[in-house]
UniProtKB/Swiss-Prot annotation:
EC number: 2.4.2.-
Source species: Pasteurella multocida (strain Pm70)
Molecular-function annotations in GO: nicotinate-nucleotide diphosphorylase (carboxylating) activity
Signal peptide as annotated in the record: none
InterPro entries, alphabetized: Aldolase_TIM, ModD, NadC/ModD, Nicotinate_pribotase-like_C, Quinolinate_PRibosylTase_N_sf, Quinolinate_PRibosylTrfase_C, Quinolinate_PRibosylTrfase_N
Domain of life of the native organism: Bacteria
SUPFAM superfamilies on file: Nicotinate/Quinolinate PRTase C-terminal domain-like, Nicotinate/Quinolinate PRTase N-terminal domain-like
Protein's gene: modD
Biological process according to GO: NAD biosynthetic process; quinolinate catabolic process
Name recorded for this polypeptide: Putative pyrophosphorylase ModD
GO (cellular component) term, any one: cytoplasm
């Protein structure tokens, strides 16, 4: 999984515990030997476990980890536990819980979307965009990968993807061949993706032979027409669908013959419920 630096882990912790735990201190519980455990309430995919472990170790807590990143577990499964002083465990509690809940939620949605797509087309690929909640992209990426998903692009420097907002600034916004030719010259090692807003644009793009045409917010009927036009043109161009694609409708697009699905839906999934219990050491 992804590497998280000490600074990133510190940021997670300091957001919540920059002045310690007032309640634990006021109750005089700080030095009491205690044990903490984290359980997944519902069956599903686990994500964020490696980050949770590192967060605990940052607080000099040495956890016992029972599952792996991306593993499917049954309801009520124990994910990790640790022993330590009550003040350390209470400082770790909420940060670790939130990382696990949010990561598991993203991973669960991703896994369900992949399953729905692959039930129709085993070659289907679910790729998540950079349209994540601000400051959560790395956590989200880690969760998507844990669930078996792919990353569409992490940032602007990774792929060549031409939007209408790029073309609006060109002297000839519809010179598709000129756009593709220039990109091949300037970035010869990268695949070229053009995004089509409608079928007219799509048909024009076919003549330029990009590697991929991304169909943005196309209805099922429009996708069907696009596939027909592609077949008539006899072009070896990959079609992807983006904009509004989610776990509820991905199978319908897959039935048409699409196998590359671009989505940000997993980032907005409901968090999974992680039960946390802190008790005195026996």
């Amino acid at each position: 999984m992804l590497y998280f630096s000490d600074n990133e882990l510190d940021d997670f912790l300091l957001e919540d515990i920059y002045r310690g735990d007032l309640t634990t201190h006021a109750l005089g519980l700080e030095s009491i030997p205690a044990e903490i455990c984290f359980k997944r309430k519902n069956a599903g995919i686990v994500a964020g476990i490696s980050i949770a472990e590192k967060l605990l170790r940052k607080l000099d807590i040495h956890p016992q980890v029972y599952v792996k990143e991306g593993e499917f577990v049954e309801a009520g499964s124990l994910l990790l536990s640790a022993k330590g002083s009550a003040d350390k465990l209470h400082q770790a509690w909420k940060v670790v819980q939130l990382v696990l809940e949010w990561s598991c939620g993203v991973a669960q949605y991703t896994a369900e979307m992949i399953s729905n797509a692959k039930a129709i087309n085993p070659a289907a690929v679910v790729a998540c965009t950079r349209k994540s909640i601000p400051n959560t992209r790395k956590l989200a990426t880690n969760a998507v990968l844990a669930a078996g998903g792919h990353i569409h692009r992490q940032g602007l420097s990774e792929t060549l993807l031409v939007f209408t907002n790029h073309r609006n600034l060109l002297s000839d916004p519809e010179d598709w061949q000129g756009i593709v030719t220039r990109l091949k010259q300037q970035a010869p090692e990268n695949k070229i993706t053009l995004e089509a807003d409608n079928l007219v644009q799509f048909e024009q793009m076919l003549t330029a032979d990009p590697d991929i045409i991304q169909l943005d917010k196309f209805t099922l009927e429009q996708v069907k027409q696009a596939l027909h036009l592609l077949a008539l043109a006899n072009k070896n161009i990959t079609l992807s669908v983006a904009g509004g694609v989610n776990k509820h409708n991905v199978a319908e697009y897959a039935k048409l013959g699409i196998q590359l699905f671009i989505t940000s839906a997993p980032y907005y999934a409901a968090p999974e419920d992680i039960k946390v219990i802190i008790e005195k050491q026996v």
